[in-house]
Amino acid sequence: MNSIRNFFKTFLLVELVKGLMVTGRYFFARKITVQFPEEKTPISPRFRGLHAQRRYANGEERCIACKLCEAVCPAMAISIESEQREDGTRRTSRYDIDLTKCIFCGFCEEACPVDAIVETHIFEYHGEKRGDLYYTKPMLLAIGDKYEAEIAANKAADAKYR
């Protein structure tokens, strides 16, 4: 009896028809493709994109050169050099992030005691050469200055979860 059933399943191509029914169901279903450059999907408030360095309201940079972000970075993408000022405080003389190494884990942002380094919502950046993805301190400060309002709003919205 089993051999007769297997013969009819094979002869009538039951498995093929079942597969085509599944394909047909998805063929006529509503499409969910997003046409990327024109349409954009919403971004989570906790999205980790391009890095930025922040300043205080008086214009002074926030980074105190504690080097916690450099120490906690698992990809070793951050390199910092610091120097003493005349008033005895320590500030960065060089702060570089190599985005070809960075894995955007957010550890640097979590480790920073003064919220100097943050990750923005910017994900549309590119480089023609490898060196274009090597961000220096002036570049990071410029990004922070440009997007400070958005960064502050995201920090305030996320404050109760930190």
From Swiss-Prot:
Membrane topology according to the record: Peripheral membrane protein
A GO CC annotation given for this chain: plasma membrane
Main localization, broad class: membrane
Binding site for [4Fe-4S] cluster 1: C63, C66, C69, C112
All copies of domain 4Fe-4S ferredoxin-type, residue ranges: 53-83, 93-122
Names of the cofactor(s): [4Fe-4S] cluster
Cofactor note: Binds 2 [4Fe-4S] clusters per subunit.
Annotated [4Fe-4S] cluster 2 binding sites: C73, C102, C105, C108
Enzyme Commission number(s) of this protein: 7.1.1.-
Protein function: NDH-1 shuttles electrons from NADH, via FMN and iron-sulfur (Fe-S) centers, to quinones in the respiratory chain. The immediate electron acceptor for the enzyme in this species is believed to be ubiquinone. Couples the redox reaction to proton translocation (for every two electrons transferred, four hydrogen ions are translocated across the cytoplasmic membrane), and thus conserves the redox energy in a proton gradient.
Assembly and binders: NDH-1 is composed of 14 different subunits. Subunits NuoA, H, J, K, L, M, N constitute the membrane sector of the complex.
Family label: Belongs to the complex I 23 kDa subunit family.
PANTHER family xref list: NADH DEHYDROGENASE [UBIQUINONE] IRON-SULFUR PROTEIN 8, MITOCHONDRIAL, NADH DEHYDROGENASE UBIQUINONE IRON-SULFUR PROTEIN 8, MITOCHONDRIAL
Protein name: NADH-quinone oxidoreductase subunit I
Provenance organism: Chromobacterium violaceum (strain ATCC 12472 / DSM 30191 / JCM 1249 / CCUG 213 / NBRC 12614 / NCIMB 9131 / NCTC 9757 / MK)
